[in-house]
Amino acid sequence: MKKINVAPENPQYRIVEIFESLQGEGWNTGMPAVFVRLGKCNLACGWCDTDYLTFGMMGLSDILGRLKTYAARNIIITGGEPTIQPHLDMLLDTLKAEGYFLCLETNGLNPAPPQIDYVATSPKACYAAKYENSCIETADEVRIVADGDVLAFCENMERKIRAHHYYLSPCEQDGAMNIYDTIRQIGILNSRPDASVHWQLSVQTHKWAGIE
């Protein structure tokens, strides 16, 4: 007999943190939002600034109760990598039913759930080979961290991902940010005679402002 998987009534989620702030990067910079940071990731970038392995389990009802204490109606589901979270669909269905605008921040190796209103994908150049076999096809914005010479990777992501906005972000390691080299690479991308998209700079303005 085939086993039927039934979702629990109050599923548990790996929660790193939930907090209200302003979106600090990309097209929606400045947008008031509640960030729901989920634990665990299917990549392990050396420069990642998120402790996605330190999390606690939290039930769906408690998550919803926490969200209702905030004024913002925009929810940013981030990580870690949200698309590997068990019972993600149930969480998203519940939030949509409550009338929230749902944004997803993902590395783009898995498809975005249909409940999402805005997809910001950040493919990782240090895992370029993985994107040859699995890659999201559409997004609202693409944000790539310039953790080296990423020109060829950016061109490949242009071909693989149809998006409205394309951003290159500086990489911060050991307190230093390679902003000059990031701007230089943006200039090269935008000066190509056959350039089909326009790349822009995205920086983590929330860090400069001293907010979460």
Swiss-Prot record:
- Single GO molecular-function term? 4 iron, 4 sulfur cluster binding
Task: Please share the entry's free-text remark on the cofactor.
Answer: Binds 1 [4Fe-4S] cluster. The cluster is coordinated with 3 cysteines and an exchangeable S-adenosyl-L-methionine.
Organism's domain of life? Bacteria
GO biological process: any one?
queuosine biosynthetic process
Its UniProt entry gives the catalysed reaction(s) as: 6-carboxy-5,6,7,8-tetrahydropterin + H(+) = 7-carboxy-7-deazaguanine + NH4(+)
E.C. number(s) listed in UniProt: 4.3.99.3
Domain Radical SAM core as annotated: residue spans: 28-212
Residues binding S-adenosyl-L-methionine: G80, S122, P123, K124
The cofactors required by this protein are: [4Fe-4S] cluster; S-adenosyl-L-methionine; Mg(2+)
Q: Name one Pfam family in it.
A: Radical_SAM
The reply to whether Chloroplast figures as a keyword in the UniProt entry is no
Q: What PROSITE patterns would the database entry show?
A: RADICAL_SAM
The UniProt annotation places [4Fe-4S] cluster binding at C41, C45, C48
Pathway annotation = Purine metabolism; 7-cyano-7-deazaguanine biosynthesis
Instruction: Tell me which UniProt keywords the record has, alphabetically.
Output: 4Fe-4S, Iron, Iron-sulfur, Lyase, Magnesium, Metal-binding, Queuosine biosynthesis, S-adenosyl-L-methionine
UniProt function note: Catalyzes the complex heterocyclic radical-mediated conversion of 6-carboxy-5,6,7,8-tetrahydropterin (CPH4) to 7-carboxy-7-deazaguanine (CDG), a step common to the biosynthetic pathways of all 7-deazapurine-containing compounds.
**Subunit structure and binding partners:** Homodimer.
Q: Which family does it belong to?
A: Belongs to the radical SAM superfamily. 7-carboxy-7-deazaguanine synthase family.
Q: What is this protein called?
A: 7-carboxy-7-deazaguanine synthase
- Per the record, the gene is queE
